[in-house]
């Protein structure tokens, strides 16, 4: 798994290039929740979904054979940008890593 760098900022965008595709993840925080959008090769796949701890970001109908992103929270807390890279992390995992746990 590859740990991606989240900034301690409420609104941000980050890019990840695997062997085949370029992903961009946009994170937006409101007073009540954190939302995300995912672009693959500059095409929006997922738009303004609520970010939930310890879940995959790309739903299975959009997932390809090369992996997925996981938003991980040590204490299963709701996403909070002040805890990014402290107790909440974003990872990219290949399908093999996801299958083997």
Regions found by a protein language model. Give the residues of each.
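Intrinsically disordered, low-complexity N-terminal regions enriched in serine/proline/glycine
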Residues: 22, 61, 71, 90-91
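Surface-exposed molecular-recognition determinants
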Residues: 66-67, 71-89
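Glutamate identity and glutamate-enriched acidic tracts
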Residues: 20-24, 44, 77, 96-97
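C-terminal charged interaction modules
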Residues: 85-101
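Short, charged/polar N-terminal "headpieces" of proteins
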Residues: 1-26
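Aromatic-residue detector
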Residues: 2, 13, 44, 54, ...
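Broad hydrophobic/π-residue packing in well-ordered secondary structure
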Residues: 18, 27-29, 33-35, 88
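Acidic, aromatic-enriched beta-alpha/helix-loop junctions
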Residues: 31-74
């Amino acid at each position: 798994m590859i740990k991606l760098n989240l900034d301690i900022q409420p609104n941000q965008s980050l890019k990840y290039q695997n062997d085949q595709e370029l992903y961009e993840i946009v994170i937006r925080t409101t007073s009540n929740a954190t939302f995300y959008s995912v672009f693959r090769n500059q095409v929006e796949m997922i738009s303004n979904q609520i970010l939930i701890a310890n879940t995959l970001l790309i739903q299975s109908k959009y997932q390809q054979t090369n992996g997925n992103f996981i938003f991980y929270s040590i204490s299963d807390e709701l996403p909070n940008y002040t805890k990014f890279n402290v107790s909440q992390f974003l990872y990219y995992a290949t399908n093999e890593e996801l299958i083997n746990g």
